């Protein structure tokens, strides 16, 4: 079973003014002690995504485990450590056949029914959310809440990542409700190094 770090930052180019700002933020996160990052780009520009992914790998690959969102082909091309798929992406077992047994595979879920189904796959970890209301995604699913997270914890022994509206103020309660890790986007954008250090301190 994989061992997830408490903090699971997600880097999305849409949150930055340009790629250089994103790369600088990634290096700040690594300097703060972050050991895992997901690169998520929904633009559909595969060439740019691959260039960015390779640059992140070159800058961080020695110290940070890198997860590619959605794109199994880019995961392999950029030599990333794992792939994360959502409910509208490749099915978990199809993704597994592409990336092989050694790379990590994560699956997003948005309710306990989806989580129970994902738990039957070869996914190494599962994500559930949104735990709280979030502004990072336009087409959000209904809020799961801490109670939904507790139910999810009862349904799986796989490592569980909570996502959606998680801040330094509520992160500890999310861990106490059963999450192994918290995925964060927005609350790391302002001063990434300081924010990550504060998250890591809160998460313990």
Locate the predicted segments by residue.
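Conserved cofactor-binding/catalytic machinery of classical short-chain dehydrogenase/reductase
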Residues: 148
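Conserved N-terminal beta1-alpha1 strand-loop-helix module at the mouth
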Residues: 1-90, 97-125, 141, 151, ...
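Glycine/threonine-rich flexible loop motifs
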Residues: 136-138
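A short, flexible beta-alpha/helix-coil linker loop
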Residues: 13-14, 132-134
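Internal alpha/beta core interface subdomains
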Residues: 179-181
């Amino acid at each position: 079973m994989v061992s997830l770090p408490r903090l699971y930052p997600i880097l999305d180019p849409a949150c930055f003014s340009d790629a250089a700002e994103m790369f600088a933020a990634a290096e700040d996160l690594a300097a703060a002690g972050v050991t895992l990052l997901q690169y998520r780009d929904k633009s559909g520009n595969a060439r740019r995504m691959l260039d960015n992914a390779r640059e992140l790998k070159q800058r961080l690959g020695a110290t940070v485990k890198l997860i590619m969102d959605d794109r199994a082909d880019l995961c392999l091309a950029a030599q990333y450590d794992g792939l994360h798929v959502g409910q509208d992406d490749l099915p978990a077992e199809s993704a597994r056949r592409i990336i092989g047994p050694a790379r990590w595979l994560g699956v997003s879920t948005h309710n306990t029914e989806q989580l129970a189904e994902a738990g039957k796959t070869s996914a190494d970890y599962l994500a559930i959310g949104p735990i709280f209301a979030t502004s990072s995604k336009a087409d959000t699913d209904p809020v799961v809440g801490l109670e939904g997270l507790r139910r999810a914890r009862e349904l799986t022994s796989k490592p569980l990542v909570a996502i959606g509206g998680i801040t330094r103020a509520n992160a500890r309660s999310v861990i106490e409700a059963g999450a192994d890790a918290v995925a964060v986007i927005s609350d790391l954008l302002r001063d990434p190094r300081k924010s990550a250090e504060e998250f890591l301190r809160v998460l313990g």
